[in-house]
Regions:
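General structural signal for secondary-structure boundaries
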Residues: 1-8, 180, 196-200
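Positively charged, Gly/Ser-enriched RNA/tRNA-binding surfaces
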Residues: 43-73, 80, 90-186, 218-346
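Short, low-complexity, polybasic intrinsically disordered segments
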Residues: 207-222
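Unusually extended, aromatic-enriched hydrophobic runs near protein termini
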Residues: 15, 106-111, 178, 199-200, ...
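Short charge-dense sequence patches
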Residues: 1-10, 112-128, 210-213
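Short, conserved secondary-structure transition motifs
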Residues: 188-208
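Auxiliary tRNA-acceptor-end handling modules of aminoacyl-tRNA synthetases
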Residues: 1-45, 62-68, 72-78, 82-101
Length: 346
């Protein structure tokens, strides 16, 4: 179908809404009995989701939990997160279906920000993406995820408040996952936490004169593979010195501030079921997060390791306000992935 690309969304909707309305009225019972990958229901009981959500809400009792609209402004993820527009699902009326709960939470938080205090919002919501998964994985195009956002203003020293909130998101999510391991029947034997500073790979990307891929994630992965650098280091008080020995100097200050905040948590030092690493190989999220990012994986008793949580610092607040004093920290935990692969519930 050819149409004028300069046509407005409202004019396009004026054409498409009646067209789809007519098509809907032509459908039969046989047509609507058919399922596709977008309309098949989750196999997980809603009771199990509610049980897990209660653990999150009880622990995070100082965070406001909200119920997001399933529709968000068209382009929200392209504008804020740099997502390829083809990975979103638009509606014919000019919105897009919620595919990233953290960007939606960010807009809600930003609208409410009117003081120097941080705003923390969270939700457990079903999101949908058009990605095609291998049938063996049993992953659906729609899935539930816990998401959390914190926005606020920087204070002196610049960046310290921001990295403190990254550490808080991380330690809160570790604490909740440990509670879930304690309070439910599951096959989880432990957790691995991978800390990264994506500024390192971003800096290496800038030195490349001839790229083999225009995709920054792919190119950054190639750079790391050809660098001879280790994939991970054990995270401890010697990590910064080890990184300096490997030649990393730019971006060290923000990492030092983050590690001070992280190491100050008592729980960091006293849980044998949580292993900590610094991940030099991570390229995922290189244009999503500013610098510090983390990933939490769960390990089962048959050595299955799957990523459950991901978080870090974004530039969304600074970008939308044109004010570098704004910071944004976002994170998410795959609650559907957790229940499907690790929990043994009724």
């Amino acid at each position: 179908m050819n149409f004028d690309k300069n046509i407005s969304i409202s004019d396009l909707a004026w054409v498409l809404v009646p067209y789809y309305g007519e098509k809907a009225e032509e459908k039969t019972f046989s047509d609507i009995k058919r399922h596709d990958r977008f309309t098949v229901s989750s196999k997980i009981s809603q009771r199990n989701f509610l049980m897990i959500e209660k653990i999150f809400q009880d622990y995070l009792n100082d965070v406001e939990f909200i119920e997001l609209s399933p529709l968000q402004p068209l382009g929200i993820n392209c504008v804020l997160a740099g997502t390829n527009g083809k990975k979103n699902i638009p509606t014919i009326r000019g919105q897009e279906i919620n595919s990233d709960a953290t960007t939606a939470l960010f807009l809600e938080a930003y609208r409410s920000l009117n003081s120097s205090e941080e705003i923390r919002l969270a939700t457990n919501v079903r999101t949908i993406r058009p990605k095609i998964f291998d049938e063996k994985s049993k992953f659906l195009t729609h899935f539930k995820v816990f998401a959390e956002i914190t926005i606020g203003r920087q204070a002196s020293p610049f960046g310290e408040k921001e990295v403190f909130m990254i550490a808080r998101h991380l330690m809160d999510e570790i604490a909740v996952l440990k509670l879930i391991r304690t309070k439910t029947k599951n096959n989880i034997v432990g957790f691995n936490v991978y800390i990264s500073n994506l500024f390192f790979l971003k800096s290496m990307l800038l030195t490349i004169t001839e790229r083999k891929s225009q995709n920054d994630v792919i190119e950054a992965k190639r750079i790391w593979e050809e660098s001879g650098l280790p994939a991970q280091l054990i995270l401890n008080s010697n990590t910064v010195d080890e990184l300096k020995t490997l030649g990393f100097n730019k971006g060290i200050r923000v990492l030092e501030m983050f590690l001070r905040a992280l190491f100050s948590h008592v729980d960091f030092h006293n849980d044998a079921n949580v292993n900590w690493f610094f991940d030099l190989s991570r390229s995922a999220g290189i244009n999503y997060y500013r610098h510090i990012a983390y990933k939490i994986t769960a390990v089962s008793n048959d050595n299955l390791e799957l990523p459950l949580a991901d978080g870090g610092s974004n530039d969304w607040g600074a970008k939308i306000s044109n004010d570098k004093q704004f910071f944004t920290v976002s994170s998410g935990v795959g609650t559907e992935l957790l229940i499907q692969n690790f929990l043994r519930l009724a």
